[in-house]
């Protein structure tokens, strides 16, 4: 890692890589996605991202975002044609069971992303937010019912919800 930073730190704004994610249903290798995904999602993992000091000085975190300040900063750098370097290397082992990565923060993340995309005041976005909120409540209720009724069925449902960029390793 030291050699990488010695060779690259003055030539790029952001170095990012992959990570291992521990979820309630297993351990996964998470490969960063193509940066074009910034249009709809967060294609890289902030724990596996190194940002040049000059970027922090020129962009600063927008602290009005409780959860998505890192997303906004990196998205802004990307759309300002910042230089990103992807390294196919696991920089982080990450626990996604608790904290901000848990599904309980999903609504706040969606709300903040709406602000970042500049869509949060539109009727369409408010409708999407309402549908998403109801969807999360229904999923939570169904998970509780499945856990109570059938452990094997619950495990199958959890496995179906694994994003494409995750590869199960245990």
PLM feature spans:
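Alpha-helical structural elements of signaling/regulatory helical domains
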Residues: 10, 82, 105, 122-123
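Conserved nucleotide-sugar donor-binding catalytic segment
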Residues: 17, 23-112, 116
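A short coil-to-beta-strand element that immediately follows conserved catalytic motifs
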Residues: 13-15, 87-89, 126-128
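Conserved donor NDP-sugar-binding/catalytic core segment of glycosyltransferases
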Residues: 1-28
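Membrane-proximal basic amphipathic "stem/tether" segments
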Residues: 118-170
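Alpha-helical structural signal in soluble globular domains
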Residues: 7, 116-119
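Extended hydrophobic/Leu-rich segments
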Residues: 8, 64, 166-170
């Amino acid at each position: 890692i030291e050699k990488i930073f010695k060779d690259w730190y003055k030539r790029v704004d952001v170095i990012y890589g992959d990570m291992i994610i521990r979820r309630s249903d297993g351990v996964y290798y998470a490969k960063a996605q193509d940066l074009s995904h910034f249009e709809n999602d967060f294609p890289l993992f902030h724990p596996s991202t190194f940002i040049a000091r000059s970027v922090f000085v020129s962009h600063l975190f927008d602290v009005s975002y409780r959860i998505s300040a890192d997303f906004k900063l990196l998205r802004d750098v990307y759309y300002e044609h910042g230089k990103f370097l992807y390294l196919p290397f696991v920089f982080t082992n990450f626990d996604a069971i608790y904290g901000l990565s848990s599904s309980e923060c999903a609504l706040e993340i969606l709300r903040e992303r709406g602000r970042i995309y500049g869509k949060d005041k539109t009727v369409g976005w408010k409708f999407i937010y309402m549908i998403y909120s109801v969807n999360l409540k229904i999923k939570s209720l169904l998970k509780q019912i499945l856990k109570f009724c059938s452990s094997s069925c619950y495990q199958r449902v959890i496995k179906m919800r694994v994003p494409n960029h995750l590869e199960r390793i245990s």
